[in-house]
């Protein structure tokens, strides 16, 4: 089968990009001939790339022009199946890794001040994305939507006129050899020494771009409420508002570290004791699976798809977004539970259910079924 995967841009810290980069070899091992359609091939390490890079000014023009050019390119090439990771109406398969934009705007509006809500309502890019999203999900050519969590599947089913049988929940996969407890043991001592933390310190790790959406403010406020000198928060990721969050964390001094984006986060997973992501909206972060694979338990919010694989007290905990006292309580609970020694094994066992080959196998079955239906 000749499969085209469509993703506009490469961001080395992006979850969708990591998914594609790791899924490509697994799909090829399963016998799929994969071509990546993108603006620039740098960074992807794909064997087959079809570049489409039309001129643009501004975000709306950028996305519209790429969608138009990508559709023209895949029609000329005659692929068996088109899987888009962008909101492009007319594809065969859409992977909803970014969730539902309209749902995120609804959740964001609940906590945003008046002027921010007004700006969101008038923002032409939000209007464009919501319109493209509706056209995509309700397009007659769309045959399947790959949802990376039940949460996303439910949001699409409730929000759009789409047949439920088109929705398929396929959790992301994780490279179990690249992220492993053995690697954590190798890196842990040096990584903690570099950070300057003591053996008895409890290090919570936050990994993600888009700090407000990922709930960094609540994590910082929870650390203030905990008021434990031995609790640290290490932040890995980039954000346009980094300075604002750094100012919020300033009273905590060295106990909050902003490390910026990292292409290899394994040393930080190794240094950490618990992963934390109290997101306001997060379809299913790859970073949660990476943390599990390294043997880290996780605290995530109920608005995060990773909550679906959390067993409270066994491999992690589920909090409510923006519930600062609740998050602080779970940080204390995590600190106590980490001393029992069973959490790392349970976290790793969770990740082992979601290897890359398992994910590729499920996708290959879906592609084969779609091919049979088209025959």
In which residue ranges do the predicted regions lie?
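A conserved mid-protein helix/loop that constitutes part of the nucleotide-sugar donor-binding site
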Residues: 17-22, 202-225, 243, 325
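Glycosyltransferase donor-sugar binding loop
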Residues: 41, 174, 207-212, 232-245
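A short helix/loop element that forms part of the nucleotide-sugar donor recognition site in Leloir-type
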Residues: 180-197, 344
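Conserved acidic donor-binding segment of nucleotide-sugar-dependent glycosyltransferases
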Residues: 312-313, 317-324, 333-338
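A short, active-site helix/loop in glycosyltransferases that binds the activated sugar's phosphate group
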Residues: 134-169, 174-181
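Aromatic "clamp/platform" in nucleotide-sugar-dependent glycosyltransferases that forms part
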Residues: 261, 280
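A short, well-ordered alpha-helix in the C-terminal region of glycosyltransferases
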Residues: 190-193, 339-353, 365
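Short hydrophobic beta-strand element within catalytic cores of glycosyltransferases
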Residues: 297-300
